[in-house]
Every structure is written in C-alpha cells, then in structure tokens.
Amino acid sequence: FKVVWANDKLYILGEFVDDILIDTHRDPLVQYWDDDCLEIFLDEDYSGGNHQFNHNAFAYHLSLDNQAIDIGTDEKPHSYSHHVESRWQQHGNKIIWEVAIDIYADDYVDGSEDNQPVSLSAGKIMGLMVAYCDNDGSELRENFIGSESVPEGPKDRGWIDAGLFGKLVLDE
C-alpha cells in the first residue's frame, strides 16, 4: 500500500490479488469482517491502547460496496462512510483500492454535529495498520493479511488494540 496526505485528508492506495470477491452479508452492519474488505486502522495521535468501544482509534472496514463500518461507543456497528471516500477497481485478479479519509481525534462523539476532522501537517505522527480480509466462499473470513506483525495472541486484534499499529510520520 502507499500513503500520501494533504492538510485535510489521508490518502491510501492498496493493491491486492484476489481471484474471488465475496460480499454475502448484504446488511453492512452484520458480519462485515467476514466478507472481502479492506481494513484501515488509524490512531490519530499514535497513543496506542484499547479502542474496542471508544474512538482512541478507528478500525474502518471498507466493504465492496464502499461503506466504512466500525464499532461505536455503544458497542454496536455504525457506518462511518461520511469519514471515508472509497473506490476500487478490478483488473483480472488484481484489486486497486483508493481511499481518502478524514482524520478524527479521540474526542469524537458518535451522532454529534460538532465533530471536526483534524488538520494534518508535516511531522505529525499517527498509528496506521492496513489489512485485507479474504473470503473465497465460506461462512467466515478465511484470511486476514495485515501490514503489521502481531508477536503473540490472536493475530486479528487490530480492532481492539491500537498498540499494534505501525508508526506513520507525515513528511513533506
């Protein structure tokens, strides 16, 4: 994957090889992690720590219909598609996925009209992990391919623990 930024957005370009695309869960809030999807994990201030039911970090699950889902503070899945612009194209077995993301701080409040994205600038340090969930036809996700190595425990803990994210330094 590649990352660039402007003062108002983070841009990510991902390339994946997948011979079978699956989106069997039509309700975007149900088992969204078990369909083919791009996951982008962002910790605005690289503070690490738990973000399972808070916004210390976001775990955007980008579906094949370009919706962005994460778990809210009420412990239920929510659409955060208003944070993300997502488009993908398929070329044979190759998937090219382009994403533009508004970055929010950990004081984000679900449902509030007062949430404002943070401004990005050179030198800012953020936490980032990118993963692809792959399902080739079973009921559950078959593969989780991530950008960061998880040394011990379950390998898919990025949706809980921002301490697993890599360090992203915004450079000029």
Stretch-by-stretch model annotation:
Residues F1-E172:
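Structural preference for beta-rich elements and adjacent junctions enriched in aromatics
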